[in-house]
Amino acid sequence: MAKEQGRKLIAQNRRARHDWSVLDTYETGIVLTGTEVKSLRQGKASLVDGFATVDRGEVWLRNVHIPEYTEGTWTNHEPRRSRKLLLHKGEIIRLIGKIQESGLSLIPLSLYFSDGKAKVELALAKGKKAHDKRQDLAKKDAQREIERAMGRARKGKW
């Protein structure tokens, strides 16, 4: 079977950018079992409740749901097991420093295949308060209204 080229999106955490202020992103590899890869190739995964932690110098992805492979047998995986993320040692050390000093969190933004390998886009993020979310919505609405007005002015319907 030929390897896929390019990037194929499997799952995206759409609430992440609403609930968190993303400060930095990292592309990480992920350690998976065979049935997990097959399940992902079917496009099944959920990142909604997912987060990452650093334990003993290793980064672990927790609470991400990859359903059991339907054609799998007794070798099937546990859907919500912890999965190891692959980062360079220097990146892990920088992450540990930022998490400890600032109280930041690691949140998965998307899960995808890149040149046949499963990757996770991991974000270093700070939680938003309710008033921050309202401000962001107000900014989006104002920007949308400006774009509408510009479009009407261009078309001469002003």
From Swiss-Prot:
Keyword RNA-binding part of the UniProt annotation: yes
Main location class: cytoplasm
The UniProt record lists the keyword DNA-binding: no
GO biological process: trans-translation
Keywords noted in UniProt: Cytoplasm, RNA-binding
Biological role: Required for rescue of stalled ribosomes mediated by trans-translation. Binds to transfer-messenger RNA (tmRNA), required for stable association of tmRNA with ribosomes. tmRNA and SmpB together mimic tRNA shape, replacing the anticodon stem-loop with SmpB. tmRNA is encoded by the ssrA gene; the 2 termini fold to resemble tRNA(Ala) and it encodes a 'tag peptide', a short internal open reading frame. During trans-translation Ala-aminoacylated tmRNA acts like a tRNA, entering the A-site of stalled ribosomes, displacing the stalled mRNA.
Name of this chain's protein: SsrA-binding protein
Source organism of this protein record: Saccharopolyspora erythraea (strain ATCC 11635 / DSM 40517 / JCM 4748 / NBRC 13426 / NCIMB 8594 / NRRL 2338)
Gene encoding the protein: smpB
